């Protein structure tokens, strides 16, 4: 479409477009020509009149159409908020040029400089005359374009609204399949249960909105080094371990308290934070016909455990000072205590129902129903021994303190076994543990008992933790045996936690050194009773899933390599090339 010009009187030019008429007043033509045939320069208006021109506002004389008016498009208008409305001028010369007076906005002043950056090439390059390269963030849930930082992660408007509806109202979704549905841009609406589960896995939480989000762009403007570092991060498909770490690595500003604030935090406030961090009681909504079979019960229990693990990560992030720990320490503490945390929660829910275990609101089992699963009768008997908790009349404040102590105390002596890396900041973990213990002592002191009775009750409560540790070891062995039988599905997060616990178990020196290192001094690793079961059983179980069995036991041991002195985790995956070390 070309505009047609009709010259009127008094220097008034009328431009006839398809949409209507536009009348403009043209300035007096210059007495001297603006262009010569010997040059190929481009027309440029005076700087004081129109300001600098962008590359898209320049037009060569030889490349334009034959119309007396040449329309030169301006730079692409991305948004009316980023680019002000353009004003057009009509120049009457020997070859009039119709151009836009829009001036390019400096990159530093554009909104979303960190999230969206556009670079416009020369006119005529690419389709439509422009080359536009767009670097933007993607939704952590469905991989669609992210609209902003919502509930602790970068997410799109759809996932943000879905998570908001879920935490405010109806959220008892049920997956019609196996709770492993693929959630992407095209299939995010197919399963609400798996979509909500993935929201929790990537780290979305109710209090995850950044307090300083209004000043992010201003801070990024003055910190180009940080912006360059964030842009250089590799973008690859996250593994399950990366997904769990990403779910636990949110902004530390969203967490309550910090290492410095813990020093001045009163015990009553610590108790309020611990009680507010408690996850809700789940509901399976799965209708299973009775009597239960082994596969039915284990399917229900593994599904319940996988959902509770997601809530447990959210619970841990709400503990005062937990987000100030390094990501390595957060993962290590959760991997070392996840089943103990789940079991003390199960005991607390079942404390008022003798002879029954309340796994979920609609999943209540007794001992007779648990006997159909091989090896579950002993675990049920230990779990049903909640009479010790009922006799002590455990209070909610004491329960939340014991639960936090289990998490923080799980990695306190990990360096003694030599099978896992120690905590990077054990001083901070010990400081958190002391704060929780002080809160427990503060609550006990308000019972109105004597000092001797207060000390006795504190000791009785802490002695319960050894009983929970013993149950956890038995439960871990049973879960691993069910995994080897491959009878029930183990979901990603539950399977990863289980494998991490097996890797961290101590092994015998004969299973750790290769035949070629006999002349070197060997270091014996202590065998802990907390691992549960014999070491020979643990080694054979580990080999059943990743290496040869039976008569191939000797080659499997020869493939193990000796670890040098120093912190490190030796992981064996079946061959000598797969034996890697995590620094």
UniProtKB/Swiss-Prot annotation:
Residues 139-204 bind DNA. InterPro entries: Est_rcpt/est-rel_rcp, Estr_rcpt, Estr_rcpt_N, NHR-like_dom_sf, Nucl_hrmn_rcpt_lig-bd, Nuclear_hormone_rcpt_NR3, Nuclear_hrmn_rcpt, Znf_hrmn_rcpt. SUPFAM superfamilies: Glucocorticoid receptor-like (DNA-binding domain), Nuclear receptor ligand-binding domain. Pfam families: Hormone_recep (PF00104), Oest_recep (PF02159), zf-C4 (PF00105). Keywords: DNA-binding, Lipid-binding, Metal-binding, Nucleus, Receptor, Steroid-binding, Transcription, Transcription regulation, Zinc, Zinc-finger. Residues 1-138 are annotated as: Modulating. SMART domains: HOLI, ZnF_C4. Residues 205-265 are annotated as: Hinge. A zinc finger (NR C4-type) spans 139-159, 175-199. Binds DNA as a homodimer. Can form a heterodimer with ER-beta. Composed of three domains: a modulating N-terminal domain, a DNA-binding domain and a C-terminal ligand-binding domain. Belongs to the nuclear hormone receptor family. NR3 subfamily. The steroid hormones and their receptors are involved in the regulation of eukaryotic gene expression and affect cellular proliferation and differentiation in target tissues. This is Estrogen receptor.
